[in-house]
Amino acid sequence: MTAAVQKTKPGSGWEKSGLEPKSALQVFGMRRSGNHAVINWLLRNPAKGSTGTIFLNNCTAWRDPIDSRKSLEVNGKRRGEKTETIRKAGTSPMVIVSYEDCAPPDPGAGKPIMRGFSAGDVSHTIIVFRSFLNWSASLLKKLRGNADYHSVTRGRIMLRSIEQYGRILARLQQPGVVGICYDAWVNSPSYRSDLLEQLGLPVVDNALGNIQRYGGGSSFQQEALSGQDLGAHQRWVEMIEDSEYLVSLWVAAQDAGLLKAVERFFPDDVALLQPLIGSHPGLGEQP
């Protein structure tokens, strides 16, 4: 049986925008984790009785999500800066608020990440995450596409992102958080339908859908149009001979706390990193 949707209450933070969402979802995740593919799928399976859909993309933490979103999508169409177009979704839409490279706040933070809103204004908090090896390979590939980033810049971004990736995995143990593993989501229709049930959403369209062009689409397959065309579980294999990628993996392998967090969800990744643990990085002879 499908779980009941936690409809937001009148007088909530949404009221100032004339909204009383049927379902309001917060979605967190690192870039290159499949966030937008998952969000598009959620939007194609809105809560029963929804009058439309609103997607507030890449919002700024601790600010009003409507004011701080980087882009807006209403009823499946990008609306840019046209905030007034949210009215096209009706008064009881499904709303998704996304945060990139950001973990849900600690329960002891004392305030909601959405300024002007309360915990009751959110039906579910979701974290989209991806296997460490595939995620890190995809991120480095994406960074390579920026001509202004030299190797030191890429290395700095990689290491800071790896640190934040570990924090996000830790938040998956937080009560009330729904984790969506992109690797499993891509490969298993039953995994997807079970998640919809957990979120109180009907199964309307359980397909992977088209490639989303937020963030430039796939790092590896720019020509791919459909999610089923992607080999998302083999990214690390395509990068395993890349020296820059191996340097990032070597540094990550020396962090026992990170490895513990990764092993909880991706033990095969940690097994593959095992030879790097405590190894010499390769400059000169090991003492």
Kindly give the residue locations of the regions a language model identified:
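Broad structural signal for hydrophobic residues in well-ordered alpha-helices, predominantly aliphatic
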Residues: L42, G116, L195, A261-V262
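PAPS-dependent sulfotransferases, especially Golgi type II membrane carbohydrate sulfotransferases
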Residues: M1-P21, L201-P287
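Extracellular glycan-modifying ectodomains
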Residues: R78-E81, R167-L169, D268-D269
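PAPS-dependent sulfotransferase catalytic domain
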Residues: G90, V95, Y99-D205, S219-H233
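Generic detection of long, well-ordered alpha-helical segments
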Residues: R32, G155-L159, P189, A252, ...
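PAPS-dependent sulfotransferase catalytic core
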Residues: M1-T91
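Residue-level marker of structural boundaries
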Residues: A47, R144-G145, G282
